[in-house]
Amino acid sequence: MGAQPASGVSRARRLVRLPWLGPVLVAGWRARTAWRHVAHEAHLAWRWWRDSREVTNFTYDLTPRNREQLAAFLVQATGAELSRVEQLMRELEDDAALHAHVLHATLASPDANLSDASPRYARRIGWYVLVRVFRPRLVVETGVDKGLGACVLASALLRNTAEGSPGHYLGIDINPQAGWLLAEPWTRVASVLHGDSLALLGNLACIDFLIHDSHHHPEHEMREYELARPRLSDTALVLSDNAHASDALWRFAKDTKRRYLYFAEQPRDHWYRGAGIGLTLP
């Protein structure tokens, strides 16, 4: 909610000059302004409690305006034309096979009562476009959870492979059940290692795209970047799914003199305020 219009400010100034009653009226006015916002957030939270099954890693769509902002962010990040970026965004959104797989696999999973079946990709649309444009040979994601992001990234890699630019997704997660959404044909280009990211990152070869989405503690996040740093290719991208709450990627970008960009999510019809995409490029 923005600033009060000039007429409202004028009325407030007149009211506040009234002896005794003026400050009380202005305080009530301010409380009403805040309550309008709080009431809307409370309504969204109630609808989520009623309709959603999720307890963490919330999924949602972006607002139409925020989706356009994501497209603008991707133009800046990739150097691609806006028309190409928008085409790639629609490519993922219109992927009927992926949509059906996520829906049916979620309904059939042991976590069906803790997950919303209908896929909502939000910022992961950006991940997809980055893979389609930059065509990395090795994508590494620390932190897989059920594997929605893994499926999105694998879908991009499958298309790249069909176009003559093969690549592979490697997920790392300490939970042995992580990645249960991955199945054929996505497993043709994707696999998951179960273990501690800090123990496994040092064993990898050349990384073209690193995504931090594991333990969201800034020092753990920075440790992952430090371990991956000597293994990054000259053109590697490094993305943080926690940049809305941590400055670790920004500190890494400054230390390595890499370009840093950030996109902030605005979820549509959800009480959660959203995460974002923190991205560093050479």
Residue spans for each PLM region:
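Membrane-proximal basic amphipathic "stem/tether" segments
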Residues: 2-79
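Generic alpha-helical secondary structure signal
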Residues: 10, 68, 83-90, 96, ...
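S-adenosylmethionine/decaboxylated-SAM
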Residues: 11, 113-118, 124-282
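Residues that form generic nucleotide/phosphate-binding pockets
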Residues: 15, 73-77, 88-91, 101, ...
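Short amphipathic alpha-helical segments, especially helix-boundary/capping motifs
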Residues: 45-48, 60-64, 100-105, 113, ...
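Intrinsic low-complexity/disordered segments
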Residues: 1-2, 209
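Class I SAM-dependent transferase core
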Residues: 80-120, 132
